[in-house]
Amino acid sequence: MTSRKRLVLSYCCLALLLAVLFALSLFWGSVALTPQAVLAALTGRGQDALSVGIITQLRLPRAVMAALLGAALSAAGYLLQTFFANPIAGPFVMGISSGAKLAVALVMVLFLNYGLLTSSAVLILAAFAGAMAAMAFVLAAARRVQRMSILVICGVMIGYICSAITEFVVAFAQDSSIVNLHNWSQGSFSGMTWGNVRTAALVVLPALAAAFCLAKPMAAYQMGEAYARSVGVDGRRFSRLLVLLSSLLAACVTAFAGPISFVGIAVPHLVKQLLGSARPLYVLPGCCLGGAAFCLLCDLIARSLFAPMELSISAVTAVFGAPVVIGLLLRRNREDVR
């Protein structure tokens, strides 16, 4: 099979998988709905107010957010892997998600304790500040270490520190807000509204568009900084853009859904294997489709496996994503031995 045919077939398969999972998200849940009822609700011809409410106010915004944030998280992971030249770099592993989680928890506890309401924009700004602070620590460590394995360990430790401080912060929350904070800190797509969708789209879509515009410089950067400079890529400016975009995407995900593990590592790796190419121009769209489908699948499992009880989304993504990362590490180890 030629590379072009493989790319087209791979994109079609990912798009079909995404469409099927999105449809399943609408009529599969604790309240079973037929495809006819879902179509009637979507087209405004639904007669049952309960079914219409479940579809338009609960399941549809949740499915849209799962797809949107899944695409953002996968793209953020790929940008970080490009920046650090390490296939296991990702928002969760490098501590970026945990830094965003800490900042959001601080803002939520502060606002809730004083009886104030937190807007989506405030949470995104807080998450971005926390993500950038965590990234600053990682970059400071990067200047002192030569081995990428040590840098990854530093990122993991920063994540643990942020998570521990977050637990202390939650301990000072009022009793009425502890449950919401706990559910959010475990990762979940529940409770999404159309207002959340609009705010997230205003952040994620321009950031993804900017990432696509960086595809060609990214390809040069993957060949080495010296080569990138020789073709006119400003290395320092390009690196800053990668850091800003990846942190912004990861922060947006954390602000709305909490920290979600392994999506940013596993999906880019799987997409590259599927496409048979590592070119950013091809991998980035695949990451968006694959990340959206992966998060929709994990969300379906999280809310359906033990319904009406709902699992945290991170627990499900870890079950599927961790084996991929383990396989990647074993493969790299075999290559190093050779």
Model-predicted regions and their roles:
Residues 1-338:
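Alpha-helical transmembrane segments in inner-membrane proteins
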